[in-house]
Every structure is written in structure tokens, then in C-alpha cells.
A protein has these predicted regions:
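Active-site rim helix/loop that mediates acceptor-substrate recognition in acyltransferases
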Residues: 18, 22, 27-54
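Conserved beta-strand in the GNAT
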Residues: 58-66, 73-78
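Conserved acetyl-CoA binding element of GNAT-fold acetyltransferases
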Residues: 70-81, 111, 135-138
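Conserved acetyl-CoA-binding loop-helix of GNAT-fold acetyltransferases
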Residues: 79, 85-98, 125
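Conserved GNAT acetyl-CoA-binding A-motif
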Residues: 100-112
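Conserved beta-strand-loop-alpha-helix junction that forms the acyl-donor binding cleft
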Residues: 110-119, 138-142
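Conserved acetyl-CoA-binding loop of GNAT-fold acetyltransferases
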Residues: 124-133
Length: 143
């Protein structure tokens, strides 16, 4: 299948990206991953997130990326299972890291489910390292 190049993640991509995320094992969505909240995230972090489409406009890969001014974060990197192994995930990560570097962000983190062995292999191949000295703590502000 012919693939277009990496393009900016726009509001029109939200619903297709959510469908992609739901169909990819290892990607977890929460209440904070609604279309309005992703739209707000994209507006707050323009140019950091990206997608890949086919020439027909079918979304086959996506990543959400943003920063807080000090640290960057990649969320929900997903490539359609039929399109894996073609460098799409690597290209999306490269796009986001380039945008973060340009913004002067020196460090980037991801959250990866501990049972996502395929994801762990992917990130290790790209040179990412597990921080065994940290754990993620979360507090829910929603009722």
C-alpha cells in the first residue's frame, strides 16, 4: 500500500486516530482521551503530533506529542498492524523529537504498559531506556 509522508495531526484526524488506537494492542485509552480533550491537546501543542495516511486518506499511524516547557511527552504511538515494519513508527517519533528539539526541550518521556513487550522492543531499538528508579503516580481529578 502506498503511504503518504508524515503530516501534522489535525482535528480531522482525531476520530480516525481514536479508532486506530482502539484497534492496537498495547495502546490504552482513558476518559482523558475524548475527542474534545485531544483537540485541546493539539491546540496547546501545535506541530508536535503527527499522522501518516494512505493516498486515499486512510489513517494508518499516529502519535500525540507535547511538552510542558521543560520536558516532552509522547503519547499513543500506534501503527496499524498491517503497516508495521515499514518505518512509520520511527518516522513519527523522528518528527515529534525534531519538533521538541526545535522548541528547546531537552528530554522526552513515554508511558508504556509493562505488559507491552512489542512496544518495549520498539522503543529499545530506538535507544530509549527504562527508568527503573521511577514509577508513575496518578491522582484523578474527575468525579
Amino acid at each position: 500500500m502506498a503511504i503518504r509522508s508524515v503530516i501534522a495531526f489535525e482535528a480531522r484526524h482525531i476520530e480516525p486516530a481514536l479508532a486506530l488506537y482502539r484497534g492496537c494492542p498495547g495502546v490504552g485509552l482513558s476518559a482523558g482521551d475524548s475527542a474534545p480533550e485531544i483537540a485541546a491537546f493539539l491546540a496547546r501543542n501545535p506541530g508536535f503530533s503527527a499522522v501518516v495516511e494512505t493516498p486515499a486518506g486512510d489513517l494508518v499511524a499516529a502519535v500525540l506529542c507535547g511538552h510542558d516547557g521543560r520536558r516532552g511527552f509522547l503519547y499513543h504511538l500506534a501503527v496499524h498492524p498491517d503497516e508495521r515494519g515499514r518505518g512509520l513508527g520511527r518516522a513519527l517519533v523522528a518528527h515529534s523529537l525534531s519538533a521538541l528539539r526545535f522548541a528547546g526541550i531537552p528530554r522526552v518521556s513515554i508511558h508504556l504498559f509493562t505488559n507491552n513487550a512489542e512496544g518495549a522492543k520498539f522503543w529499545a531499538k530506538l535507544g530509549w531506556r527504562l527508568r527503573a528508579d521511577l514509577s508513575v503516580q496518578q491522582f484523578e481529578l474527575r468525579d
